Amino acid sequence: MFWISLVCLSVSHKMIGMCYLLVAILCGFLGYIYSLFIRLELSIIGCGVLFGDYQYYNVLVTTHGLVMVFAFIMPVMMGGLVNYFVPVLSGFPDMVFPRLNNMSFWMFMGGFGALVSGLLTEEGMGIGWTMYPTLICVDFHSSLACDFTVFAVHLLGVSSILNSINLLGTLFCCRRKFFSFLNWTLFIWGSLITALLLIITLPVLAGGVTLVLCDRNFNTSFYDVVGGGDLLLFQHLFWFFGHPEVYIIIIPVFGLISTMVEVLGFRCVFSSVAMIYSMILIAILGFFVWAHHMFVVGMDVDTRAYFGSVTVLIGLPTCIKLFNWTYSFLYTDFIIAFEA
């Protein structure tokens, strides 16, 4: 009973971070098992390991994508490593809203439970991890599995938003006097930028999937062409979240690598200020390139030229980061010890 209360009711940032890491790693193993079934099915001609059940193959693809994105990668970085290390690196005793931190973890658990419920309900949700209409519309998937999936996305998104608000409150409200923003490690900067990305993009995704629920259950026609809706509206809303999601995943890793370089090399990364500005620039440009995921839908030439050009621009701040890391590696004596 003591251990159950310690885990379930704990408000310690370290305990919550470890719970996030443990659950997310288990979810990662589950997603990996799904990917093995997908590869086995593709490697066999004719009826494979799924015995010709094409719907269940689509369910596996959907669950694998959603689990890996929402239940593995994001919780490992923002829920696990950020929760555990940001207060330690900042000199704070804990996060500014400890109970909100605990609430975000249990909302994450509830979202994962809703996702598993969608997997096990009737024939499952064979809609793809992007959840495009018309596959998710009631005419093609009338079961409650799709509703469970949308509800899971809502819960997982709210969990990430609460976690991000907690992080922003911790960094800005608990900042010590005379402690400059430039004194933050690059991992803290990466976590801050990622939290802002989550707060901006997740409500857009939530709005898009809420309209899906309305189409399925309340006879609206936001994505029904016959009723005056637009199928591409959901794609724009989804990829406005989906492309910054790439940077939500990678920017904390940028900061983590920079911090590892500093620790192993016993010196600051070359041009830390440029590293901060490059992460900020990557995040800003990431909001203006979402439609390069939609080139096949028939956009005009000017639109494709714009999104393609801005996509190329993201390579510039990325090159700055790679140059600074390379320079730090070349002119630093790293100490890496391997124990027998």
Swiss-Prot record:
Entry EC no(s): 7.1.1.9
Residues holding Fe(II)-heme a: 64
Gene Ontology, cellular component aspect: mitochondrial inner membrane
Transmembrane segments: 18-38, 42-62, 66-86, 100-120, 148-168, 186-206, 237-257, 279-299, 305-325
Source taxon at top rank: Eukaryota
GO molecular function annotation: cytochrome-c oxidase activity; heme binding; metal ion binding
Cell compartment(s), UniProt: Mitochondrion inner membrane
Cofactor requirement: heme; Cu cation
Enzyme class: translocase
Catalysed transformations (reactions): 4 Fe(II)-[cytochrome c] + O2 + 8 H(+)(in) = 4 Fe(III)-[cytochrome c] + 2 H2O + 4 H(+)(out)
Gene3D superfamilies reported for this sequence: Cytochrome c oxidase-like, subunit I domain (1.20.210.10)
Binding, Ca(2+): 41, 46
Annotated metabolic or biological route of this protein: Energy metabolism; oxidative phosphorylation
Positions annotated to bind Cu cation: 243, 292-293
GO biological process: electron transport coupled proton transport; mitochondrial electron transport, cytochrome c to oxygen
Record-listed cross-link 1'-histidyl-3'-tyrosine (His-Tyr), residues: 243-247
Cofactor note (record): Binds 2 heme A groups non-covalently per subunit.
Function: Component of the cytochrome c oxidase, the last enzyme in the mitochondrial electron transport chain which drives oxidative phosphorylation. The respiratory chain contains 3 multisubunit complexes succinate dehydrogenase (complex II, CII), ubiquinol-cytochrome c oxidoreductase (cytochrome b-c1 complex, complex III, CIII) and cytochrome c oxidase (complex IV, CIV), that cooperate to transfer electrons derived from NADH and succinate to molecular oxygen, creating an electrochemical gradient over the inner membrane that drives transmembrane transport and the ATP synthase.
Subunit and partners: Component of the cytochrome c oxidase (complex IV, CIV), a multisubunit enzyme composed of a catalytic core of 3 subunits and several supernumerary subunits. The complex exists as a monomer or a dimer and forms supercomplexes (SCs) in the inner mitochondrial membrane with ubiquinol-cytochrome c oxidoreductase (cytochrome b-c1 complex, complex III, CIII).
Family designation: Belongs to the heme-copper respiratory oxidase family.
Protein name as catalogued: Cytochrome c oxidase subunit 1
